[in-house]
Amino acid sequence: MDFSIKPLDAKSTIASIKTGCIAVAVFEDKKLSAAAQALDQKGGISAALKSGDISGKAGSTLLLRGVSGVAAERVLLVGLGKEDPVSEKDFSSAVQAVARAFTSLGATEAVIALPLDAVAARDAAWSIRCTILNTRDASYRFDSLKSKKEPAPAGVKKIVFAVSAASTAIAKDAIAQAVAQANGIDLTKDLGNLPANVCTPTYLANTAKKMAKEFKLQVEVLDRKQLQALKMGSFLSVTNGSVEPPKFIVLKHMGGKAKDAPVVLVGKGITFDSGGISLKPGAAMDEMKYDMGGAASVLGTMRAIAELKLKLNVIVVIPTCENMPSGSATKPGDIVTSMSGQTIEVLNTDAEGRLVLCDALTYVERFKPAAVIDVATLTGACITALGHHNSGLFTRSDDAHDALANELLAAGKASGDTAWRMPIEDSYQEQLKSNFADMANIGGPAGGAVTAACFLERYTKKYTWAHLDIAGTAWKSGAAKGSTGRPVPLLTSFLIQRAQTAR
C-alpha cells in the first residue's frame, strides 16, 4: 500500500482530481462536508442524502459512479456521524469503512478528502495516522505457511490524501510516522502468528540480527553459557525443560546524543508456554505461542523507530526461551537464585514470565536508563480485571513514576492503543512471602496481576520503571484469531513524543 498527498489550491480543486475514487464525508443531519459540497455541483450527492440512500451515521457508505462535474470515476460517501465535533470513535469507524470499501473497488488509486481537522481535540496529522493504520490493518494477511495461498484482494493500492497546501509538511510527516508504525505492527503480527516450531528463541534472535543489519543497529545475542556466567538463575530455571536453547537479545538504536540516557524496552519472549510441570489445560493451549507477544511488540517498535531514524537512544532487551515439561524441568517448590542475588521459591512453574523478566530487569541496570518499560503477556488475572480493551499499566507512586505513567497513558489514548493504570502497593507484597526463600513466584489467586507486577517491582529499584501487562490485548481468539500488533502504537507514540521533547 502506497500513501501520498495531493495539495489543493485555487488551481487544483477536489472536483478536478482524476482518480479511480474519491472519498468524502457526510453527516447525520444530512449535511455535506466541504469536500462533498465541492463535488455536488449538479446536486447528485445531496439528492442521495435526502433520499435516505445513506444515513450519515459513522461508518455508513454509499458508492456513486459518474457524478456529473467530477473528474473522479467514483465518489464514496462516508458517514462521519455528528458534525460538531466529530468524535475519535466516529472518525475511526468511518476510516475503517473506507478501508473495507477500498479493498473491493475496481480502482487501484483513490483519494481521501475527509475533513481531517474536524476530530475533537485532534489535528490533521492524527487523522492521517488513524486512516493509514486502519487501512493497513484491513489489508493485513498472514498466509505464508499455506500451500495454496488465497489470491491477493484487488482494490486500491495507492491512497492519496487531499490536503491544503499549508498542511503539506505536516501531512508528509504524519504519513512517514504512520507507515513506519504500520510496518512495525505487521512485524509484530507476523512473529506472533508464526507457530512455535518456527518462531523459536533462535528465530527471534535471527530476526533481531536481520533488523540490525537493515537499519544499522547494534545487536548482541547471549547464549546459555553467557547467561550462566551472569548468574541468571531465575531465567535459566525456566529453560530447563526444553531442548530449544535460550537466547538473551540486546538490540540498540542510538539515535540520540551519546550522553543521553536510553529508554529501555524489555519484552517477555516465551515462544511457547506449556506451563511446565504446572501444565496448562489442553483447551486453547495452541494460543500459548502468543506468549512472546512482549518480545514481538518491542521488536516491532524498534523497527518503527529505526525506520524513522528517531533521535533517541532506545535499547530493546528480550529474554527468550520455551517453558516445557520434561525430566529436567524446574519443579514446584524448587528455589532458584536470580541475577540480583534474591532467591525465589517457584510454587507454580506456569508463573514463568516474571522469572525471565526479573533477571532482564536486573541486567538493564548497566545502561543507567532514563526509563525502563517491560512488556509482557504476564497474567490471566489482567484479562479478568480489564478484559481485552486496555493493557494493564503498573508503576510505583511517586513524582517520577507518575510522570512516566501519564506519558504512557497519553500515548495510548493518542494512538488508540489504550492502557489503564493499576496499583502497586506494599500491602500486596505480603502475598509474595515464602517460608523458604526471599519470595515466592505467586501470591495466591487474589489480585494476580498486581502481585505479578509487585514481584517485578522488587528488581527495579535503581531506575524509573513501568510494566505493561498485555495478556488481554496482544492477540484475539475465535474466528478473528491472530496477533493484534499491540502495544506497538502506544510504545512508538511514547518514544516519538520523548524524542520531540528531547530536541
From Swiss-Prot:
Subcellular localization(s) per the UniProt record: Cytoplasm
GO molecular function annotation: manganese ion binding; metalloaminopeptidase activity
Gene3D superfamilies xrefs: Leucine Aminopeptidase, subunit E, domain 1, Zn peptidases
Residues annotated for Mn(2+) 2 binding in this entry: 268, 273, 291, 352
One GO cellular component term: cytoplasm
One of the GO biological process terms: proteolysis
Cofactor: Mn(2+)
Keyword Electron transport: no
InterPro entries assigned to the protein according to its UniProt record, in alphabetical order: Leucine_aapep/pepB (IPR011356), Macro_dom-like (IPR043472), Peptidase_M17_C (IPR000819), Peptidase_M17_leu_NH2_pept (IPR023042), Peptidase_M17_N (IPR008283)
EC number annotated for this UniProt entry: 3.4.11.1, 3.4.11.10
Top-level class of the enzyme under EC nomenclature: hydrolase
Keyword Protease: yes
Bilayer-crossing regions: none
Alphabetically ordered keywords of this record: Aminopeptidase, Cytoplasm, Hydrolase, Manganese, Metal-binding, Protease
Pfam hit, one: Peptidase_M17_N
Residues the entry annotates as binding Mn(2+) 1: 273, 350, 352
Residues at the catalytic site: 280, 354
Main location class: cytoplasm
Cofactor note text: Binds 2 manganese ions per subunit.
Record's catalysed reaction(s): Release of an N-terminal amino acid, Xaa-|-Yaa-, in which Xaa is preferably Leu, but may be other amino acids including Pro although not Arg or Lys, and Yaa may be Pro. Amino acid amides and methyl esters are also readily hydrolyzed, but rates on arylamides are exceedingly low; Release of an N-terminal amino acid, preferentially leucine, but not glutamic or aspartic acids
NCBIfam families documented for this protein: PRK00913.1-2, PRK00913.1-4, PRK00913.2-4
Entry's family note: Belongs to the peptidase M17 family.
Role, per record: Presumably involved in the processing and regular turnover of intracellular proteins. Catalyzes the removal of unsubstituted N-terminal amino acids from various peptides.
Protein name in UniProt: Probable cytosol aminopeptidase
Species for this entry: Herminiimonas arsenicoxydans
Gene name as annotated: pepA
